[in-house]
Amino acid sequence: MSTFLISCGGTGGHLSPGIALAEGLQARGHSVRLLISHKKVDARLIAKYPRLDFTRVPGTGFSLHPVRLARFIGTQSRGLWFCRGLVRAARPAGVVAFGGFTSAGVVLAARWRGVPVALHEANRVPGRAIRVLSRFANRVYLPPGVRLASAPPGAVRPMGLPVRQEIRRVSQTDARARFGFAVGQKLLVVFGGSQGATVLNDWVRREMPALAAEGVQVCCVTGLGKGSDETVELRTHAGQPVRIQFLTFCDCVPELLSAADLVLSRAGAGTIAELVRCETPAILVPFPQAADDHQRANAAFFERQGGGVVVEQTMMHSVRAEVLDVIFDEELLRKFRGNLQRMDRANSLELMLNDLEEMTRTHGASGSPGTATAVVT
């Protein structure tokens, strides 16, 4: 079968769908090698996947600050040189990039050697890397309804985000038992994506006594480097114990989302895809400094589809009231869950796998048989 390179590191939003795609390719007998960045979040997440082959590539994020810009240019140059050697040695049938600062090297190296390239953009506003690299792509996968003028004619395919096989709803009772939360109380899960969100962490610290007083348990995933693992016991108005838990990282996403009655989170595309798959209603607080304001666009679409509600970061003072209104409204929660089930009908992973195989057949490229190669960047 064929070899594929998948560029998908730097954030959980890139890495998770890359892993999902790599597993799908392996299941079909293809070879996969994952190229990842040097960031801590990549190292933490890949520890669960010893069967996949990960390779770190040089790269740092873009910045207009003179020192960081110089570093960006330097690491991009090293990354391009590294990827030229990688593509020459691997002889892939195709390269897939999920965006981010490590995509350029492998995409350009592939094009120089005539290897077909597919790009996947998960957000409803395409990022800089996807916009720039789309002119070199044979396929550009975009969320339904999103357009990209720079993409070659006929290259765009509507596509959702591939989700890892283990991301699926499980029994709420079993999920709560795993984390030690009571079944008879409401549970709010708070997290800011793979890198955490200080604003949400601070909100939990400030509001946890009031939430506990109403009988709402909280599990807050702070993000690496943004606190330490900690459990606090508070009381309801009636004196019953309420568990408040802080975790720096959680690699049990299906159990965590299944345990929750409601999630309070940022609005990255990866987070939203996992909420949809686990059918967990959410209050989304878009990160206002996200590139091209893509989180606000993601959140607005999620709200229009009926998966939850959106609160702007400038309105954090109103979030506690919003949480309490939603989390105790069983009819509204049922409505949200039904809408999330409807949103999850399309199997994006299978659709993408089929199209990638068609792309490589049409292009006529042939890779060496063996393992699937996923490049996590």
Swiss-Prot record:
It is a peripheral membrane protein. One of its GO terms (biological process) is lipid glycosylation. The lineage of its organism: Bacteria, Pseudomonadati, Verrucomicrobiota, Opitutia, Opitutales. Belongs to the glycosyltransferase 28 family. MurG subfamily. Gene3D superfamilies: Glycogen Phosphorylase B. One of its GO terms (cellular component) is plasma membrane. UDP-N-acetyl-alpha-D-glucosamine binds at residues 11-13, 123, 164, 194, 295. It catalyses: di-trans,octa-cis-undecaprenyl diphospho-N-acetyl-alpha-D-muramoyl-L-alanyl-D-glutamyl-meso-2,6-diaminopimeloyl-D-alanyl-D-alanine + UDP-N-acetyl-alpha-D-glucosamine = di-trans,octa-cis-undecaprenyl diphospho-[N-acetyl-alpha-D-glucosaminyl-(1->4)]-N-acetyl-alpha-D-muramoyl-L-alanyl-D-glutamyl-meso-2,6-diaminopimeloyl-D-alanyl-D-alanine + UDP + H(+). Its EC number is 2.4.1.227. GO terms for molecular function: UDP-N-acetyl-D-glucosamine:N-acetylmuramoyl-L-alanyl-D-glutamyl-meso-2,6-diaminopimelyl-D-alanyl-D-alanine-diphosphoundecaprenol 4-beta-N-acetylglucosaminlytransferase activity; undecaprenyldiphospho-muramoylpentapeptide beta-N-acetylglucosaminyltransferase activity. InterPro entries: GlcNAc_MurG, Glyco_trans_28_C, GlycoTrans_28_N. Cell wall formation. Catalyzes the transfer of a GlcNAc subunit on undecaprenyl-pyrophosphoryl-MurNAc-pentapeptide (lipid intermediate I) to form undecaprenyl-pyrophosphoryl-MurNAc-(pentapeptide)GlcNAc (lipid intermediate II). It is found in: Cell inner membrane. Keywords: Cell cycle, Cell division, Cell inner membrane, Cell membrane, Cell shape, Cell wall biogenesis/degradation, Glycosyltransferase, Membrane, Peptidoglycan synthesis, Transferase. CDD domains: GT28_MurG. Pathway: Cell wall biogenesis; peptidoglycan biosynthesis. This is UDP-N-acetylglucosamine--N-acetylmuramyl-(pentapeptide) pyrophosphoryl-undecaprenol N-acetylglucosamine transferase.
